[in-house]
Amino acid sequence: MKIWFPIQIRFRDLDPLSHVNNTVYATYYEEARSAYFAHIPHWPLAGEHATESSEKEEEHTARIQTTVVGRHYGILIKEITCTYHLPLIRTDRVEVGSAVVHVGRTSIVMEHQIRDIQNHERIFSTGRAVAVWCNYRTGRPVPVPSALRAAFEEIEGHAFPLET
């Protein structure tokens, strides 16, 4: 994992058995993705498509609510998976890691891990998220901008060649 983000386990995160509810893990992964993207200068790079994309202008879809002055491009989560290794409880001190492991033509695959903040061998969960770079007005996938691909390559320390 490249970017680590500390998580504060809250009382509201717990189920009746005082474990972190299984659905909360996805929220922890989401917070880690946000922390990861905060390391990218000028995120979300929304203006790049004006010169890079050949997509034609399509009608706005009511499924995605944006304002006229809002961002037109960004990620939508297509898939999230989580494997639970150990239960999390209120007193655990943990951090969530994120790494980009694949960049496709329109998709970005990230892996996540929740671990003990001091004992890094104590892994609570591992997960994966598939995000799609979309035009928010149309709800349709568009190519990942080259500047975003380059930012991922810089953070991760290796290339993500454009698939042909």
Report residues per predicted region:
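Residue-level signal for pocket-adjacent positions within structured domains
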Residues: 9-15, 70-71, 137-139
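Short loop/turn motifs enriched for small/polar and acidic residues
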Residues: 12, 78, 113-115
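HotDog/MaoC-like acyl-thioester-processing domains
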Residues: 3, 84-93, 100-164
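Short aromatic/hydrophobic contact patches that present stacked aromatics
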Residues: 8, 81, 130
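Hydrophobic beta-strand-centered segment that forms part of the acyl-chain substrate-binding groove
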Residues: 36-109, 124-126
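Residues that recognize and position ribonucleotide moieties
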Residues: 7, 18, 73-75, 122, ...
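Acidic-residue sensor for enzyme active/binding pockets
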Residues: 30-31, 79, 111, 156
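Catalytic strand-loop segment that frames the active site of acyl-thioester-processing enzymes
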Residues: 1-43
